[in-house]
Amino acid sequence: MMVAALLAASLAFGPEDAAFAEKATREFVETCTPRDAGTIRGGIAANWILDRASMTGADVRRDVFQAMTPKGMRRFVNLYAEFPTNPTSRWVVLVSHYDTKPDTGCPGANDGGSTTGLLISLANVISEWREQHGNVMLVWTDGEECMGERYSPDDGFQGSQRAVRYLQEKKRQVQAVLCLDMLGDADLSISVPANGDATLAKIAQHAARRIGEKGLVKPMKDAVKDDHVAFMDAGYRAIALIDFDYGPGNAWWHTPEDTCEKLSRDSYLKAGRLVCEMLGILL
């Protein structure tokens, strides 16, 4: 119990980390929008993430692959930042997609942008304490968004499906997969979709209480199609942590209204503290 408490205390996400995440998101959105999957702009976004992740001291890998889409074969890029500490320990995997929804004019500041910046900031925090925690992997996935109106077997989640194969090929023993999505909303309310691991959902709520944010995380009655589904289908324990109430009636989602002005440093702080608390519990 004492070791777990020390781990939770060491992985602290503070106001300066929230400010860093907010700044990183703004720079990412301003520099790399649009960043639709399978496009040149998407490749530019991947390079931007690679550069920032490489500065954290992680073992960084770029995974370029091709996958079928409704528009034919397309080139996708996943990024992995690994913090290995103990070869016998299991891994906790944090996931964020970075691509934008095609043909919508959506800048993806919250949807794809906010958690891209958050993961980079979390990488800095994890790097500082890497000798005191278990194995952590951060994954930025391409191709989460579908090109059409609805997801289909060859439209959407190409990046998360590829990440599953990466974990299998590398024989990573995984404790949990936490998929982060749309967590910069100034009016932050984090939901856990019903089609996720029930134990991880309870851990998320417990972690929220431990950081003094009892009502921050709420279970959903409905299932949501997000990156966590690919990991669940492969037998991994996974959940999505998502704010699916972005604007009145979720009106800003996948629209030109998804801008950095809708985001809040305080929301980054809450989300970052929640994730670090969950890492402290899981590791």
Where do the PLM segments sit?
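A non-catalytic alpha/beta surface segment that caps or lines the substrate-entry region
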Residues: 23-84
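Sec-exported extracytoplasmic/periplasmic mature domains
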Residues: 26-34, 50, 54-58, 121-131, ...
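N-terminal capping segment at the start of a domain
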Residues: 11-44, 56, 99-100, 180, ...
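Active-site-adjacent substrate-binding region
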Residues: 34-37, 62, 176, 185-283
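Proline/glycine-enriched tight loop/beta-turn segments at coil->beta junctions
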Residues: 85-91
